[in-house]
């Protein structure tokens, strides 16, 4: 699922977020803040 350009895909819960995704170390973006 692709997100609109101004949204970010958070891979853990597969949500499109208007806020930044929380990260853990060097892992990919995980979830919405």
UniProtKB/Swiss-Prot annotation:
Source organism: Vaejovis mexicanus
Keyword flag Lipid metabolism: no
Keyword Secreted (UniProt): yes
UniProt superkingdom: Eukaryota
Region (Essential for stimulation of [3H]ryanodine binding to RYR1) residue spans: 23-24
Descriptive protein name: Vejocalcin
Protein location: Secreted
Molecular functions per Gene Ontology: calcium channel inhibitor activity; toxin activity
């Amino acid at each position: 699922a692709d997100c609109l350009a101004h949204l970010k895909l958070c891979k853990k819960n597969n949500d499109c977020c208007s806020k930044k995704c929380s990260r853990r170390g060097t892992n990919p973006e995980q979830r919405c803040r």
